[in-house]
């Protein structure tokens, strides 16, 4: 991958920083693994906005990604190509299994076209192979981690994400996540070795507001720029600071307030995130 800083040939190009990957497939995606993806504009079935800042954007197809990798144990797969996926920050890899089936997976870092991957208890320890956590050596870097056996990957799926397996005790293993959180996960759960591809994603700069609109993201208006009827920070004569600690449009504390309320899984967290 290469970081390309564009020349300022126009105001919209002046601040553009691209991540260029020559290995990405330039043709169409694999059609049998595509599904229709409808735009909602952030509205529900009543036409009311339920999620702000959503609307417009380029038409997209959803790529069916295999997050489980539990029904092809022992079957070797060849990486046909690495592709761009508009639905996620990571790249995806198209696998051709020895039995003739093709599937998409999250592309691990360092995996390229022509590589051989395999899942199952007897899989060798190398990036891209999927095993149960009990079969992965302590100290290994993993991604695409399940929280429940057979449910599919839920942790460490975005670009550059990973976790480290730091301990094994009884039926649990302990993982250190990128956030600093240390968490216990059942050793029966699966994970993929290595870290997720496209780790340079955070270095890019879109350069202009229109590039956000192409991605379906609408503008965010500050509360202090609104009227009192629209936001708790609204109104006042001239420019104001809002007059109170930052809150959402509905009056809930924002900017750092704790929102986690899942007490059921608190026992699985060994150390909270930093």
UniProtKB/Swiss-Prot annotation:
Compositionally biased tracts (Basic and acidic residues): 263-274
Keyword Ribosomal protein: yes
Keywords: Ribonucleoprotein, Ribosomal protein, RNA-binding, rRNA-binding
GO molecular function, one term: rRNA binding
PROSITE patterns documented for this protein: RIBOSOMAL_L2 (PS00467)
Region of interest called Disordered, as start-end residue ranges on this chain: 28-54, 224-274
Recorded GO CC terms: large ribosomal subunit
InterPro entries to which the protein is assigned, alphabetical: NA-bd_OB-fold, Rib_uL2_dom2, Ribosomal_uL2, Ribosomal_uL2_bac/org-type, Ribosomal_uL2_C, Ribosomal_uL2_CS, Ribosomal_uL2_dom3, Ribosomal_uL2_RNA-bd_dom
Gene3D superfamilies linked to this entry: 2.30.30.30, Nucleic acid-binding proteins (2.40.50.140), Ribosomal protein L2, domain 3 (4.10.950.10)
One GO term (biological process): cytoplasmic translation
Subunit structure: Part of the 50S ribosomal subunit. Forms a bridge to the 30S subunit in the 70S ribosome.
Family stated for the protein in its record: Belongs to the universal ribosomal protein uL2 family.
Function: One of the primary rRNA binding proteins. Required for association of the 30S and 50S subunits to form the 70S ribosome, for tRNA binding and peptide bond formation. It has been suggested to have peptidyltransferase activity; this is somewhat controversial. Makes several contacts with the 16S rRNA in the 70S ribosome.
Protein name: Large ribosomal subunit protein uL2
């Amino acid at each position: 991958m290469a970081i390309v800083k564009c020349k300022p040939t126009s105001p919209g190009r002046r601040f553009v920083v691209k991540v260029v990957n020559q290995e990405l497939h330039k043709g169409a995606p694999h059609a049998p693994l595509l599904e229709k993806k409808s735009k909602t504009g952030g509205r529900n079935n009543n036409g009311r906005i339920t999620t702000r800042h959503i609307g417009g954007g380029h038409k997209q197809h959803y790529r069916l990604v295999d997050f489980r990798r539990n029904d092809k144990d022992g079957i070797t797969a060849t990486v046909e190509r690495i592709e761009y996926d508009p639905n996620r920050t990571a790249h995806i890899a198209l696998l051709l299994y020895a039995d003739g089936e093709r599937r998409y997976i999250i592309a691990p870092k360092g995996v390229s076209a022509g590589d051989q991957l395999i899942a199952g208890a007897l899989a060798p320890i190398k990036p891209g192979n999927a095993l149960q956590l009990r079969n992965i050596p302590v100290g290994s870097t993993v991604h695409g981690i399940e929280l429940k056996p057979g449910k599919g990957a839920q942790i460490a799926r975005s670009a550059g994400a990973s976790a480290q397996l730091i301990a094994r005790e009884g039926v649990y293993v302990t993982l250190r996540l990128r956030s600093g959180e240390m968490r216990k996960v059942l050793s029966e759960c699966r994970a993929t070795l290595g870290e997720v591809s496209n780790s340079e994603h955070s270095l890019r700069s879109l350069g202009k507001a229109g590039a956000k609109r192409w991605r379906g993201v609408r503008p965010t208006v500050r509360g202090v720029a609104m009227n009192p009827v629209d936001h708790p920070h609204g109104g006042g004569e001239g420019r104001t600071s809002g007059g109170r600690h930052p809150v959402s449009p509905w009056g809930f504390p924002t900017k750092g307030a704790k929102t986690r309320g899942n007490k059921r899984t608190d026992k699985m967290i060994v150390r909270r995130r930093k």
